[in-house]
Amino acid sequence: MQNDPIGLMDSGVGGLTVLKEVQRLLPTENTVFLGDQARLPYGPRSVAEVTMFTKQIAQFLRQQARIKALVIACNTATAAALTTMQQTLPIPVIGVIAPGAQAAVQTTRNHRIGVIATAGTVKSDQYRRDILAAAPNSQIFSVACPEMVTLAEQNDLTTTHAQSVVAANLASLMDKKIDTLVMGCTHFPLLRSAIQHAVGSQVTLVDPGLATAEQTVAILKTRGLLNSATTRGTAQFFTTGETDQFDTLASQWLDQQPTPAKHVAIAQLTTPMEVN
């Protein structure tokens, strides 16, 4: 089981930002990633629907690759489905919100923290609850930024148009005197430059992907699941969307040249499968 891959899932390509950190911290681990681009965005969908999608993807990854752990590299899916998945799967399941919230608490100096995310993540209130549980004196300002997900998926990251959209989405945070901003959607680190420009250098950006990768290391070590290999691990990619679009962004973002993604039809996810 130690040689089995770590599974990662997202609504699109944003979860590659988490995969990048996992590969950096665990270079010998095998990984398999599925981006559900055909059903993007998850943000406006109901908790029940996002949970169903998450279950389908987990089942697919377990059937295809016998994953030893699942990283829900999507804030919306973490908010909706993490507890359910942890209760139903016989493998470790790691989400991105708790690690991101803890990183924000450790980063802030004035305890005024901004959170940018999808509508679903903001509505769940999970970041606010997790931050306040660790630091009750914090003030949290949350903003839903669905247009920024679209920018990332379209690989529109550094244009004047992208900067304008980001600035408009973050405008309501400008008078809140935050010193820390959580990028509470795994797509948003792709827009780091535009986000930093919009909020100014006095605001520290928190990427939950790094903290999530660190938690993944700790959990695998505790469970005795770390791969003992000394060679670089393999990486498989699946998408329910256009493979060319996925491959372009994956090759730009990841440190190593990725293998081409394989297309997965939605019917393959919705058809019941046997999982050993």
UniProtKB/Swiss-Prot annotation:
This enzyme's EC code(s): 5.1.1.3
Domain of life: Bacteria
One family name in Pfam for this protein: Asp_Glu_race
InterPro entries: Asp/Glu/hydantoin_racemase, Asp/Glu_race, Asp/Glu_racemase_AS_1, Asp/Glu_racemase_AS_2, Glu_race
Broadest EC class assigned to this enzyme: isomerase
UniProt pathway: Cell wall biogenesis; peptidoglycan biosynthesis
One Gene Ontology molecular-function label: glutamate racemase activity
Active site as annotated: 74, 185
GO BP term, example: regulation of cell shape
Keyword Isomerase among record annotations: yes
Residues that bind substrate: 10-11, 42-43, 75-76, 186-187
Catalysis performed (reactions): L-glutamate = D-glutamate
UniProt entry tagged with the keyword Isomerase: yes
PROSITE patterns with a match to the protein in the record: ASP_GLU_RACEMASE_1 (PS00923), ASP_GLU_RACEMASE_2 (PS00924)
Keyword tags: Cell shape, Cell wall biogenesis/degradation, Isomerase, Peptidoglycan synthesis
Main function: Provides the (R)-glutamate required for cell wall biosynthesis.
Family designation: Belongs to the aspartate/glutamate racemases family.
Protein name: Glutamate racemase
